[in-house]
Amino acid sequence: MADKHKHVDEVSGVETTGHEWDGIRELNNPMPRWWVYSFYATIIWAIGYAIAYPSWPMLTEATKGMLGYSSRAEVSVELAAAKAAQAGNLEQIASSSVEEIIANPQLQQFAVSAGASAFKVNCAQCHGSGAAGGQGFPNLNDDDWLWGGKPQEIYQTIAHGVRHAPDGETRVSEMPPFGDMLTPELMQQTAAYVVSLTQAPSQPHLVQQGKQVFADNCASCHGADAKGNREMGAPNLADAIWLKGEGEQAVITQMKTPKHGVMPAWLPRLGDDTVKQLAVFVHSLGGGE
């Protein structure tokens, strides 16, 4: 009975599938033989693959396959080979100071490459992928160093961090809040003077008064010339590099309620070798001393 209702296309003489969409019918042509054979071939290939390689998940592991192949075992072999190739350089790094590593061209090249990888994983989240930093996070490409840019000084900062309380050798500096010590007028004068060191202030007539306020309250840390003090971690205010924000209002805000960043001590987390590699990498960025 069903054959009596089959529709045949008048032009091609081929039966249709019997369905119609907005007057459009589909010819019931058989699939090309090459397509059918290809389809069967993929089925055979899949069955062969499932037999030869690990494929079917079990309760504790997958079937091992007739070839006994394991991608994890292959990766383990490659990792072991890579570690063996690096062993010589790593041994030299372990027994050398940061300065000695930099003095050895081959070892420096290895340390810079390894340090760059460690930087991307552990440091780029704050300092940026290009180490250019951001507001509150120092730019590591320039030569504006709070604690010094010599190899061992960089190592010390990375190893023990900044204001990382659990580490007894961490870098520590703290600017007191001047909001309770100075009037708004005095802070405005000081901000005018600080800004005048690198650009034109909005109120030039306050600069001389601010210079005196600075000498009385700020020079003990930042220096009489406002160029900072690395022993105390006091930043240079006479350059055009601003860590917490630029302009008089940013200076006033930092004076009134100072913000102090925290950098973790990386030595316990990464180990001495990796910290040395990071120090060599940061030193190589262009601002190292």
Swiss-Prot record:
Any one GO CC term of the record: plasma membrane
PROSITE patterns: CYTC
Side Cytoplasmic, residues: 1-33
Transmembrane region(s): 34-56
One GO term (biological process): proton transmembrane transport
Co-factor(s): heme c
Main localization of the protein described in the UniProt heading: membrane
Periplasmic side: 57-289
Involved pathway(s): Energy metabolism; oxidative phosphorylation
InterPro entries on file: CcoP_N (IPR032858), CcoP_N_sf (IPR038414), Cyt_c-like_dom (IPR009056), Cyt_c-like_dom_sf (IPR036909), Cyt_C_IC (IPR008168), Cyt_c_oxidase_cbb3_su3 (IPR004678), Cytochrome_c_Oxidase_Subunit (IPR050597)
Compartments, record wording: Cell inner membrane
Residues holding heme c 1: 123, 126-127, 263
Residues annotated as binding heme c 2: 175, 218, 221-222
Keywords, sorted A to Z: Cell inner membrane, Cell membrane, Electron transport, Heme, Hydrogen ion transport, Ion transport, Iron, Membrane, Metal-binding, Oxidoreductase, Plasmid, Repeat, Respiratory chain, Transmembrane, Transmembrane helix, Transport
One GO MF term attached to the UniProt entry: heme binding
Listed Pfam families: Cytochrome_CBB3, FixP_N
Membrane topology value: Single-pass membrane protein
Stretches assigned to the Cytochrome c domain: 110-198, 205-286
Signal peptide: none
Membership in a protein family: Belongs to the CcoP / FixP family.
Subunit architecture: Component of the cbb3-type cytochrome c oxidase at least composed of FixN, FixO, FixQ and FixP.
Function in brief: C-type cytochrome. Part of the cbb3-type cytochrome c oxidase complex. FixP subunit is required for transferring electrons from donor cytochrome c via its heme groups to FixO subunit. From there, electrons are shuttled to the catalytic binuclear center of FixN subunit where oxygen reduction takes place. The complex also functions as a proton pump.
Name of the protein this chain belongs to: Cbb3-type cytochrome c oxidase subunit FixP
